[in-house]
Amino acid sequence: MEPPDAPAQARGAPRLLLLAVLLAAHPDAQAEVRLSVPPLVEVMRGKSVILDCTPTGTHDHYMLEWFLTDRSGARPRLASAEMQGSELQVTMHDTRGRSPPYQLDSQGRLVLAEAQVGDERDYVCVVRAGAAGTAEATARLNVFAKPEATEVSPNKGTLSVMEDSAQEIATCNSRNGNPAPKITWYRNGQRLEVPVEMNPEGYMTSRTVREASGLLSLTSTLYLRLRKDDRDASFHCAAHYSLPEGRHGRLDSPTFHLTLHYPTEHVQFWVGSPSTPAGWVREGDTVQLLCRGDGSPSPEYTLFRLQDEQEEVLNVNLEGNLTLEGVTRGQSGTYGCRVEDYDAADDVQLSKTLELRVAYLDPLELSEGKVLSLPLNSSAVVNCSVHGLPTPALRWTKDSTPLGDGPMLSLSSITFDSNGTYVCEASLPTVPVLSRTQNFTLLVQGSPELKTAEIEPKADGSWREGDEVTLICSARGHPDPKLSWSQLGGSPAEPIPGRQGWVSSSLTLKVTSALSRDGISCEASNPHGNKRHVFHFGTVSPQTSQAGVAVMAVAVSVGLLLLVVAVFYCVRRKGGPCCRQRREKGAPPPGEPGLSHSGSEQPEQTGLLMGGASGGARGGSGGFGDEC
């Protein structure tokens, strides 16, 4: 069995199907229109920005419009575009006086050149697609501007730490930014956490101003209750600003210091340069007494001298300095300084004293004069006296060699080596830069002391006649001795370098037999006596003529050589005309032998030796060639 309404349902189904077919066949039956619009767009001031509005899907015909939402809520239309076929027809309606004006590009996007703070609005894109419906989307435009350099104006007055409430410290300015920057304060690089509500310890106030350009300027004023520790503190402020994409920046101001007023708590009083660690100053120096209190600003100082428990005021100034030109021993004593600070606490000691001690050293006095003459081998005592404060120390030296400490110098069994300059030096151990000296010259009177020497000496018996020798005599004494030689030619006496008091003379001569017999004497003399020395040479050998011996040896050698040559020549030419002629002239009578005795050979040899030398003289053609 069918339900009662079955026929009605059966009859309605074909109608619904037909309606669906008709709607599907209608050209305006399309999907719902949707838009792609970025909800937030960020840009830096002065840069260009493009707001995108893209319909999704395919629509042959639609109308795109851009609206601006102003502060009153009104929505003036800026531009529109109509899609006809494949092209978009653009129409600008209201530029709102913007320069450069708004523009639509070929894709229906809204273009804002050189973005300004006034462009920071909501921009609405509306697309009407007929039967597909109408879509609307909003893009929020934020324009960012970096503020100018942060400026700070500190309080240039004198701020008292005795105030029990916060005082104005400085004002910080950050101008022409967007959005409005934030200002923070710093002391010695550490951020100050100060509230914005007024309280005695510190707070800050802020004020934001919109400039004619639409940019924002922020002013912050800092108030603090100051302490004495803030006298050396450095303060500054910083502006924190925002940038696109969630970034941030910071601009710090220059640092500054405050001028504070605080009472004196401690006073110092001392002797300035020059002074020694023990507190002494030298007589004649320029001395400064320095007084300093730790209050600010600098208080007034009263400098005085105590004499018989009475104050003698010497100077009153704001520097706390007292200068004593060319200080003398009479200025030794007690000096004082008082700080005139009426804001100081009752238990603070505002007065200080010190003891000025002037060191002095008078010229030294010797018991002897500048020159002391003493006989050889005698003794003497010299005293050195001095007055000074603190007690001086005395020391004796000679040629920088220490001799002893104390005022007395004892000289005993003096010799010529004792001659020289003796120095008494006085010094103050606690004042190293203060010292004096006094000296005297010791002259030892006595007969001369003599020393002799030979240059290249030889042992006894090694001298030969004609050998050259240099003799040297050296002497010392006082008065200076004179040097003389027993022969002429001695050099003048001259001081010996590096040997104080010694003079020297030299004599160069040739050794002879007479010198060997008599010797050479050198004598040193002065009014106290003389000393004499004789140089002896021992046995002197006669000089052999080496040249004559050499000539004789050569002559003998040449003669023997000529004799051998002559004999050899005659043997080779035996029987020749020359030999026969010689035999005719000098042959013995017949029957006598050629050599009758041993002595008959010598004349012939002599003749042979002489023939070579005399034959040429006799005939001009002689020589060994004419005689055998």
From Swiss-Prot:
Residue span of region Disordered: 579-628
Species this chain originates from: Homo sapiens
Protein name: Basal cell adhesion molecule
Phosphoserine modified-residue sites: S596, S598, S600, S621
Signal peptide annotation: 1-31
Chain spans, region Interaction with laminin alpha5: 309-312
Entry-linked PANTHER family: BASAL CELL ADHESION MOLECULE (PTHR11973:SF17), CELL SURFACE GLYCOPROTEIN MUC18-RELATED (PTHR11973)
GO BP terms in the entry: angiogenesis; cell adhesion; cell-matrix adhesion; signal transduction
Regions of compositional bias (Gly residues) in chain numbering: 609-628
Gene: BCAM
Keyword Repeat applies: yes
CDD domains: Ig
Location in or out of the cell: Cell membrane
Subunit structure: Homodimer. Interacts with ITGA4:ITGB1. Interacts with spectrins SPTA1 and SPTB1.
Phenotypic consequence of E584A: Extremely reduced binding to spectrins
Side Extracellular, residues: 32-547
Cytoplasmic-facing ranges: 569-628
